[in-house]
């Protein structure tokens, strides 16, 4: 197969892996009823006028299954940290002590679990669409290269087959990631 086709397939592979990583990252921030530092990954704290990731202004730990402890490096950061977590649309209610913030993780209701599963499935679908869009773009590049005579018809056919296989594997992996997260959320 021609190097152009190989380059296109390598790019496709890399972009599918990136999509899978992005899905894992997004799903790590989804609440499951147990404490996880990833829950607070998207929380931004107002640090002297700049929205800053929480883990850049404090140390986070999980001492118990349903508790996250946030220990700011500066005591003056306690009120903004509390506000950022409360405003983070995570359904969490932080409480401050003199030098740290405790974030109890409430148990999820059955209704809330089902809602979260819906969100998880939706994120999975969005990422499947992203994978298919990557395949479509790569397919167009192969077709243009074939039309321009840069690769032969046989090489184009082989590349399209490999592309489809790669896409199917990516979609299957997304299904596996979503199923694992679903199981995690529904587990009481």
UniProtKB/Swiss-Prot annotation:
Fetch the InterPro entries from UniProt.
Answer: Ribosome_recyc_fac (IPR002661), Ribosome_recyc_fac_dom (IPR023584), RRF_sf (IPR036191)
Pfam families from the UniProt entry = RRF
Q: Specify the superkingdom.
A: Bacteria
- Listed GO MF terms: ribosomal large subunit binding
Q: What is its main location?
A: cytoplasm
Any single biological process term in GO: cytoplasmic translational termination
Q: Which family does it belong to?
A: Belongs to the RRF family.
Note the PANTHER family from the entry. MITOCHONDRIAL RIBOSOME RECYCLING FACTOR PSEUDO 1, RIBOSOME RECYCLING FACTOR
Alphabetical list of HAMAP family matching this protein:
RRF
Q: What does this protein do?
A: Responsible for the release of ribosomes from messenger RNA at the termination of protein biosynthesis. May increase the efficiency of translation by recycling ribosomes from one round of translation to another.
Protein name per its UniProtKB record: Ribosome-recycling factor
Its gene is frr
